[in-house]
């Protein structure tokens, strides 16, 4: 288990927490002075009242909560949102309402999941060509939608 330093920028901010013993993501909560209503097709930056210090070589990703997506069509437009190890500002969550009804976020609502992962840096090697594969340049749905097991 890695240690991540965290500062409550507001006393009432909730620390991220795993909901179950084997959860990959920690629930992240809104830290609001007043409710925020997302009208259909609108987005807002929701504060968490938290700042974190990740160890070098790690990132945190913010991801949508499946229940909010399923029941209310609330998501993160930049999912996964990356928090870099050298960022020290407040963690904010951009929420978007893809639904047809207004959705209100209240203080303490669990609005996203945070997954902390190790990341490797890469060094690109510029070459004249790439090796051939069966797939080649096929992309963007080239394998179709129907199951191949039919």
Curated annotation (Swiss-Prot):
User: What Gene Ontology molecular-function terms does this entry list?
Assistant: dUTP diphosphatase activity; magnesium ion binding
Pathway annotation: Pyrimidine metabolism; dUMP biosynthesis; dUMP from dCTP (dUTP route): step 2/2
As cofactor, the record names:
Mg(2+)
UniProt-annotated stretches for the region Disordered = 130-150
The residues the record assigns to binding substrate are: 65-67, 78, 82-84
EC number(s) given by UniProt: 3.6.1.23
Q: Which UniProt keywords apply?
A: Hydrolase, Magnesium, Metal-binding, Nucleotide metabolism
GO biological process, alphabetically ordered: dUMP biosynthetic process; dUTP catabolic process
Which top EC class is given?
hydrolase
* Family matches, as CDD domains: trimeric_dUTPase
Known function: This enzyme is involved in nucleotide metabolism: it produces dUMP, the immediate precursor of thymidine nucleotides and it decreases the intracellular concentration of dUTP so that uracil cannot be incorporated into DNA.
| Family under the similarity heading | Belongs to the dUTPase family.
Protein name (Swiss-Prot/TrEMBL): Deoxyuridine 5'-triphosphate nucleotidohydrolase
Q: Which organism is it from?
A: Chlorobaculum parvum (strain DSM 263 / NCIMB 8327) (Chlorobium vibrioforme subsp. thiosulfatophilum)
* Gene from which the chain derives: dut
């Amino acid at each position: 288990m890695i240690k991540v330093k965290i500062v409550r920028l507001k006393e009432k901010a909730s620390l991220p927490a795993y909901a179950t013993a084997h959860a990959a993501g920690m629930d992240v909560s809104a830290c609001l002075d007043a409710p925020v209503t997302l009208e259909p097709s609108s987005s807002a930056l929701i504060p968490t009242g938290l700042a974190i210090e990740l160890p070098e070589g790690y990132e945190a990703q913010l991801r949508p909560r499946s229940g909010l997506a399923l029941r209310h069509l609330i998501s993160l437009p930049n999912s996964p949102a990356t928090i870099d190890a050298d960022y020290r500002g407040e963690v904010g969550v951009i929420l978007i309402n893809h639904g047809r009804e207004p959705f209100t976020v209240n203080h303490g609502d669990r609005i996203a999941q945070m997954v902390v992962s190790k990341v490797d840096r890469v060094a690109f090697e510029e070459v004249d060509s790439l090796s051939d594969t069966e797939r080649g340049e096929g992309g963007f749905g080239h394998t179709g939608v129907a199951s191949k097991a039919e």
